Amino acid sequence: MPLLDSFTVDHTRMAAPAVRVAKTMKTPHGDTITVFDLRFCRPNLEVMPERGIHTLEHLFAGFMRNHLNGEGVEIVDISPMGCRTGFYMSLIGAPEEQRVADAWKAAMADVLKVKDQKQIPELNEYQCGTYQMHSLTEAQDIAQHILDNAIRVNQNDELTLPKEKLAELHI
């Protein structure tokens, strides 16, 4: 099975919160698609609670679009990582990491402004697969953690696992 790009970086050296360009590619029409790793927690040391990350998933995508879309950028998708340490954001365009970090901070400030669970978009059995598994309080705790810390940039060339280590791991 081919090794996915996300598994060629050393998770023990990742900073969090941090932005990382996980992948870039060109479409057949020449558009750039960029996938960002938005790392909320240090891998294997911290994890976002499931109710909080689920609520954040419902809020984050809209708020990020409000702050990042435009000037050659259009968010396609923002999805939580299965390991619950961050989100992947796929977009058309190639914004600088600092622009992404600034939008991320602004989106987290927006999360703190949500006053009631009833304001969470798509929070019903018709539009959400586990609509009862939410916590606005946990989502706001996650947002506050991001706002309380500087967002760094994780560089792939500093995190790439050496070929010897990949061989040792039998990959």
UniProtKB/Swiss-Prot annotation:
Coiled coil: none annotated. Binds 1 Fe cation per subunit. The keyword ATP-binding does not apply. Fe cation binds at H54, H58, C128. Keywords: Autoinducer synthesis, Iron, Lyase, Metal-binding, Quorum sensing. It catalyses: S-(5-deoxy-D-ribos-5-yl)-L-homocysteine = (S)-4,5-dihydroxypentane-2,3-dione + L-homocysteine. Signal peptide: none annotated. GO terms for biological process: quorum sensing. Its cofactor is Fe cation. Gene3D superfamilies: S-ribosylhomocysteinase (LuxS). GO terms for molecular function: iron ion binding; S-ribosylhomocysteine lyase activity. Disulfide bonds: none annotated. It comes from the Bacteria. It is an enzyme of class 4 (lyase). Its EC number is 4.4.1.21. Belongs to the LuxS family. Homodimer. Involved in the synthesis of autoinducer 2 (AI-2) which is secreted by bacteria and is used to communicate both the cell density and the metabolic potential of the environment. The regulation of gene expression in response to changes in cell density is called quorum sensing. Catalyzes the transformation of S-ribosylhomocysteine (RHC) to homocysteine (HC) and 4,5-dihydroxy-2,3-pentadione (DPD). This is S-ribosylhomocysteine lyase. The gene is luxS.
